[in-house]
UniProtKB/Swiss-Prot annotation:
Similarity comment text for this entry: Belongs to the GrpE family.
Organism: Vibrio vulnificus (strain YJ016)
PANTHER family membership: GRPE PROTEIN (PTHR21237), GRPE PROTEIN HOMOLOG, MITOCHONDRIAL (PTHR21237:SF23)
Described purpose of this protein according to its UniProt entry: Participates actively in the response to hyperosmotic and heat shock by preventing the aggregation of stress-denatured proteins, in association with DnaK and GrpE. It is the nucleotide exchange factor for DnaK and may function as a thermosensor. Unfolded proteins bind initially to DnaJ; upon interaction with the DnaJ-bound protein, DnaK hydrolyzes its bound ATP, resulting in the formation of a stable complex. GrpE releases ADP from DnaK; ATP binding to DnaK triggers the release of the substrate protein, thus completing the reaction cycle.
Region listing for Disordered, in residue ranges: 1-20
Keywords annotated in UniProt: Chaperone, Cytoplasm, Stress response
Protein name per the record: Protein GrpE
The keyword Chaperone belongs to this UniProt entry's keyword annotation: yes
């Protein structure tokens, strides 16, 4: 080959090298830009993931809060229903206590009356009928008599007025009822006054 051809080949090689270097330089700028965008995207993704986790935590907290509030409302509703039920049951408590002396007086009148006297018989029948009607009416509202004669003594239901020895009764048994007790819907409003065997 001639010198001239060598020069042309060398020039062509130089131009080709320059073009490759230029392409590499252009590629390098694009790579740098792409890497910067990738880094920015990764940071943005990390921020979004953190925000998502925080939002999920808040949602879970709100759900727990709602569940607690629902449970509290349910408990309050249940307590209110129980209190209303109790108020209905025992609203008559004081009124029933005031009626007990009337029942006692009617029973005393029946016991004191001479059933053999013809003049007293119609009056006695009227008092007995009044007593029966009165007791029936108050029993409809949950008032019940406590008459524990012969039963074991129970301090929740009975009030011991005296204790006596008795060979005919077991120890700690009610021998005699001095005054009947009464309960209203399972709650004692007046304990029975009793004599207990020793």
């Amino acid at each position: 080959m001639s010198n001239e051809e060598n020069k042309i080949n060398e020039e062509a090689l130089k131009q080709q090298d320059a073009a490759e270097v230029e392409v590499e330089a252009v590629g390098t700028d694009a790579d740098i830009e792409w890497n910067e965008e990738a880094d920015e995207s990764a940071v943005k993704i990390a921020e979004l993931e953190a925000a998502l986790l925080a939002s999920e935590a808040r949602v879970k907290e709100q759900q727990d809060s709602v569940l607690r509030a629902k449970a509290e409302v349910e408990n309050m509703r249940r307590r209110t229903e129980q209190e209303i039920d109790k108020a209905r049951k025992y609203a008559l408590n004081r009124f029933a206590e005031e009626l007990l002396p009337v029942i006692d007086n009617l029973e005393r009148a029946i016991q004191a009356a001479d059933a053999e006297s013809e003049a007293v018989k119609p009056l006695l029948e009227g008092v007995e009928l009044t007593h029966k009607t009165f007791v029936d009416v108050v029993s409809k509202f949950g008032l019940k008599e406590i008459n524990p004669e012969g039963q074991p003594f129970n301090p929740e239901w009975h009030q011991a007025m005296s204790i006596q020895e008795s060979p005919d009764h077991e120890s700690n048994t009610v021998m005699f009822v001095m005054q009947k007790g009464y309960e209203l819907n399972g709650r004692v409003i007046r304990p029975a006054m009793v004599m207990v065997a020793k």
